[in-house]
């Protein structure tokens, strides 16, 4: 759906969309906006987005895709759900985990000992129900909205990916605006970002309570063990040029 929206923006049928991960298909540097075990917490995410590398990512969106980011919004940490508690990477052995169709997800979970299985999100609930897969990973909002509490007992707080997205407008559409309207548009985007962050934080606490009320058991995990095992594999999968960018991100976000 996201790729279709991008196509329609290029055709001039629609003007705006929201990114959710598909941008990584267009340029290698964009993979850093959706990479497991890269960032340790939300503060690190904010540091990356507002750094020179974050601005480079935004420039690449304009150059390679023809889409201009209008600020960013938090999507929450991705956590692993399962029907057995997962506290350490050792508990993952042979666990069949649904992942998005993104190489870094496959590389990371395979390195941790699991069996990552790329699958469309629309197929996840029924596959969990039927036992085709045993686990999946998503932010609280996606876990709640998809009803995964009906087919998964444990919510393991891996926080393995700090996710964000971008409200996007077609660059051609943006450049067609008069100068004064561009300024108003960008100011509105800044106000939207502040408002969204406030809504996000409020919603996260509500979602956790709702998921617990639905019977999910929250499990604290050894985050350091997950990070150490996962990030090395992701790093090794990158090109030499992107490995240098990775190192820079780690310095920025410490």
Model-flagged regions — what are they?
Residues 1-44, 53-254:
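N-terminal secretory/targeting leader peptides
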Residues 47:
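Short beta-strand-centered segments that line the small-molecule binding cleft or hinge
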């Amino acid at each position: 759906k996201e790729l279709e929206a991008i196509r329609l923006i290029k055709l001039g049928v629609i003007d705006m969309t929201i990114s959710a991960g598909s941008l990584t298909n267009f340029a290698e540097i964009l993979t850093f906006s959706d990479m497991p075990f890269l960032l340790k917490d939300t503060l690190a995410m904010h540091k990356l987005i507002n750094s020179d590398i974050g601005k480079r990512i935004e420039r690449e969106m304009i150059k390679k895709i023809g889409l201009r980011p209008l600020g960013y919004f938090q999507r929450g940490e991705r956590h692993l759900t399962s029907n057995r508690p997962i506290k350490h990477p050792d508990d993952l052995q042979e666990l069949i985990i649904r992942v998005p169709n993104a190489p870094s997800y496959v590389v990371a979970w395979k390195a941790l000992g699991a069996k990552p299985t790329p699958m469309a999100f629309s197929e996840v609930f029924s596959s969990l129900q039927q036992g085709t897969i045993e686990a999946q990973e998503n932010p609280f909002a996606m876990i709640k909205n998809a009803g995964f509490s009906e087919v998964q007992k444990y919510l393991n707080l891996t926080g393995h990916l700090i996710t964000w997205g971008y409200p996007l407008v077609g660059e051609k559409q943006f450049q067609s605006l008069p100068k004064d309207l561009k300024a108003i548009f960008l100011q509105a985007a800044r106000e939207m970002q502040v408002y969204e962050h406030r809504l996000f934080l409020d919603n996260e606490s509500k979602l956790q309570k709702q998921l617990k009320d639905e019977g999910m058991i929250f499990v604290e995990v050894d985050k350091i063990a997950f990070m150490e095992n996962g990030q090395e594999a992701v790093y090794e999968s990158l090109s030499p040029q992107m490995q240098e960018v990775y190192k820079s991100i780690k310095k920025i976000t410490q």
